[in-house]
Amino acid sequence: MEDGKKAASMSAEKQKALAAALAQIEKQFGKGSIMKMGDAEVEPVQVVSTGSLGLDVALGVGGLPRGRVVEIYGPESSGKTTLTLQVVAEMQKLGGTCAFIDAEHALDVTYADKLGVKVPDLLISQPDTGEQALEIADALVRSGSVDLIVIDSVAALVPKAEIEGEMGDALPGLQARLMSQALRKLTGTIKRTNCLVIFINQIRMKIGVMFGSPETTTGGNALKFYASVRLDIRRIGSIKKGDEVVGNETKVKVVKNKVAPPFREAIFDILYGAGVSREGEIIDLGVEAKVVEKSGAWYSYNGERIGQGRDNCREFLRENAELAREIENKVREHLGVTPMGAVTLAEEVEED
């Protein structure tokens, strides 16, 4: 009996001490700096579409998560910048503000416009050094008014000491230290301001690797740890119209995912000058989900024929955007992914 009273008394003292500690923390760091998980509802992850229906499904939550760091890497001409510009276009459709930090000094504004990016509204910076690029990113994140920042690319974030030094100077680990410091500084602010930051990265080969993949990404290991999502993008084939190559068949693997199960893959077409062939994906996934019926070469929707052959069907959906959106939303519902255009950023602000 006495033991029970003693235990209850100790438990009450512990609760009292915990309440005092929580009050002190809230007084020092502000309300909401610490809370019990049961006190607040777990909010669903806010996402922005990648512009590819298949990749949105592979990501498990319907797109790239906001308030997180994302890394997109792959070989040259695999579609890294194209995919990222599609994300920019999707964020702008929701009414978001986007910034593109072009460390490679290679952004093709005309191509971005063709992919649906509202170029006059896009914030563009072409910094001289890696430090300058990351300081600009930090300032934009801290402002709380930017919804998406793209840094193209990590390999081009050259430290100031390297630019000011001589050719051939050995400066080991300088870029890795720069990235590590920047990510330590950025991560907390990115979460608070709900800004999505995408780092585009290149592939390098490790020398003397006997077992496992010799491939690695630039900028050290920090980005691998801080990124919530890592996408490996590869070109796996060409799309031809007669003898002319009109696009690439692309495969994206979700190498890391902190918001849904990883290691899923998506295969889609990237057409030159047009970007990801959304209509092609709607047809393929629509047939899989039995939303679109396929009989021989003919494709039908709700009992009505929409085209003979995949190319004709794709062209029909491109010309009938409302029908394409209707089919896409049915496919998304079937696959358990958020419907397109469900909530815009303006509506989110009004709700708050």
Curated annotation (Swiss-Prot):
ATP binds at G74, P75, E76, S77, S78, G79, K80, T81. One of its GO terms (cellular component) is cytosol. GO terms for molecular function: ATP binding; ATP hydrolysis activity; ATP-dependent DNA damage sensor activity; damaged DNA binding; single-stranded DNA binding. Can catalyze the hydrolysis of ATP in the presence of single-stranded DNA, the ATP-dependent uptake of single-stranded DNA by duplex DNA, and the ATP-dependent hybridization of homologous single-stranded DNAs. It interacts with LexA causing its activation and leading to its autocatalytic cleavage. PANTHER family: MITOCHONDRIAL DNA REPAIR PROTEIN RECA HOMOLOG-RELATED, RECA. It is found in: Cytoplasm. Disulfide bonds: none annotated. It holds the Pfam family RecA. One of its GO terms (biological process) is SOS response. This is Protein RecA. Belongs to the RecA family. Keywords: ATP-binding, Cytoplasm, DNA damage, DNA recombination, DNA repair, DNA-binding, Nucleotide-binding, SOS response. CDD domains: RecA. It comes from Ralstonia nicotianae (strain ATCC BAA-1114 / GMI1000). InterPro entries: AAA+_ATPase, DNA_recomb/repair_RecA, DNA_recomb/repair_RecA_CS, P-loop_NTPase, RecA-like_C, RecA-like_N, RecA_ATP-bd, RecA_C_sf. The keyword DNA-binding applies.
